[in-house]
Amino acid sequence: ALGRCYIPNDRLSEIGLNHEDLHNPDSIDVFRPLYDSYLDLTCDHYDSAINYIRMIPRKYRSLRMACMLPVVIGLDTIALLRKGNVLDASERIKVNRSRIRKIAVSCLISTRFKGMENRILSRAANRALNGI
C-alpha cells in the first residue's frame, strides 16, 4: 500500500519479475515461492526469539510476558501473510484486536505454567510456518 519493496532486484529477476510486477495482484502465483522463502527465514529468526524466551528464568514473569507478546503476534501475522495476497493493496493483512486480546491473556496466564507457555509458542510457530 505504501509502494515500498524490500525484495532485491536480483531475486525478483530470478523468477522473471520486477518491482513493477509487484503492483499487480495477479503476480502472486509467481511471487509466492520467493515470498514464502523470506517468510521461512523470518520464522527461523522467530525460533531464536522463542529460544531466548525459554532461557529467561521462570521467576521473571513480566519479562517473559513482554517478550512473548510481540513474538506470538508476529508469528500470527506471518501465518496471515502466508494465506493472503500481499500484492493486493485492497486486502488488509493484520491480526485483529480480538485476537490480540486473546493472545495477551493467553501469554499472561501461560507465564505461570511452563507447559502452557511452550504450547502457545510452539503452536504460534507452527501456524506461522504452515500458514494455518
Regions found by a protein language model. Give the residues of each.
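Catalytic cores of Mg2+-dependent Asp-rich isoprenoid enzymes
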Residues: 1-132
